């Protein structure tokens, strides 16, 4: 009878350098190695912590002020984290006090904005804390070049994606973008999502929004995300729509030409044979 080693490495081990996904974990007997099991539990704990981490909106507001950006601190109709998680509908609307504060601001600053900029904690305040400022810096470089007017950064605690529609409507904005923490994954507890809407108003569904996902250092870069967002904004203004009828066809320069990419072949199979 042939004996097999107790510990075994996966032949796909070399591919682990290409992805944070849990592949090529190996085995110990009929189970995972201890290191892989502990790493899984640690990643799961990180994801849970990201969901429950409080949104430091005051700290983010202070950092924005240091960069010369005004901000407004608002709250959704969800009074706390428990109600936010149990009642998604409450996170989609502003509280009565916040809605009135925004109306008062709009009355004092008539004329509206081209773009309402909203930041909400979503399901990962960690993502917002890490990525909001560097992304906004890249985005504002490009919006300034287009001559678009931006609202103060509206910080919404316990907010969900659709809360940006109410913010945009109350501010009289032509477009809105909300930066929001995405649902944490086991390899990405700090993924930031961008949701863009043309002519925002209360009651719009996801079909009217465009999403740019996984904005973080290990995912979509800040510059690339800003480039895609600006493309959507230009096309939305030209075609006067957003959502499923507006496709992201932004041309992105790559390090390799198409011809070079074809010569590489499938990375799983190695270079093509002559």
Swiss-Prot record:
Give me the reactions it catalyses.
Answer: ethanolamine = acetaldehyde + NH4(+)
State the EC number(s). 4.3.1.7
The protein's gene is named eutC
Q: Which family does it belong to?
A: Belongs to the EutC family.
Spell out the PANTHER family in the cross-references.
ETHANOLAMINE AMMONIA-LYASE LIGHT CHAIN (PTHR39330), ETHANOLAMINE AMMONIA-LYASE SMALL SUBUNIT (PTHR39330:SF1)
User: What GO terms describe the biological role, i.e. biological process, of this protein?
Assistant: amino acid metabolic process; ethanolamine catabolic process
Q: In which pathway does it act?
A: Amine and polyamine degradation; ethanolamine degradation
According to its UniProt record, where is this protein mainly located? other
User: Single GO molecular-function term?
Assistant: cobalamin binding
Name of the featured protein: Ethanolamine ammonia-lyase small subunit
- The scientific name of the source species is Pseudomonas fluorescens (strain ATCC BAA-477 / NRRL B-23932 / Pf-5)
Q: Where is the signal peptide, in residue numbers?
A: none
CC cofactor note: Binds between the large and small subunits.
* Database matches in Pfam families: EutC
């Amino acid at each position: 009878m042939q004996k097999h080693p107790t510990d075994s490495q996966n032949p796909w081990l070399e591919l682990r350098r290409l992805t944070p996904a849990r592949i090529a974990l190996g085995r110990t007997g009929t189970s995972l190695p201890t290191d892989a099991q502990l790493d899984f539990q640690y990643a799961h704990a990180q994801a849970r912590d990201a969901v429950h981490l409080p949104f430091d909106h005051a700290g983010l507001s202070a950092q924005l002020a240091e960069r010369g950006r005004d901000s407004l601190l608002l709250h959704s109709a969800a009074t706390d984290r428990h109600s936010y998680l149990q009642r998604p509908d409450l996170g989609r609307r502003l509280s009565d006090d916040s809605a009135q504060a925004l109306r008062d601001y709009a009355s004092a600053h008539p004329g509206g904005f081209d773009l309402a900029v909203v930041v909400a904690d979503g399901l990962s305040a960690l993502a917002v804390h890490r990525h909001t400022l560097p992304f906004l810096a890249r985005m504002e470089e490009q919006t300034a070049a287009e001559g678009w007017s931006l609202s103060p950064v509206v910080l919404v605690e316990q907010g969900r994606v659709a809360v940006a529609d109410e913010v945009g409507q109350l501010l009289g904005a032509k477009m809105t973008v909300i930066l929001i923490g995405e649902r944490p994954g086991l390899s990405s507890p700090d993924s930031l999502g961008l949701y863009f809407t043309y002519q925002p108003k209360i009651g719009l569904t996801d079909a009217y929004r465009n999403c740019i996902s996984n904005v973080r250092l290990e995912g979509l870069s800040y510059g690339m995300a800003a480039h895609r967002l600006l493309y959507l904004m230009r096309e939305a203004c030209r075609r006067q729509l957003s959502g499923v009828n507006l496709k992201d066809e932004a041309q992105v320069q790559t390090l390799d030409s198409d011809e070079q990419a074809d010569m590489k072949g499938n990375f799983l199979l190695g270079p093509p044979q002559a």
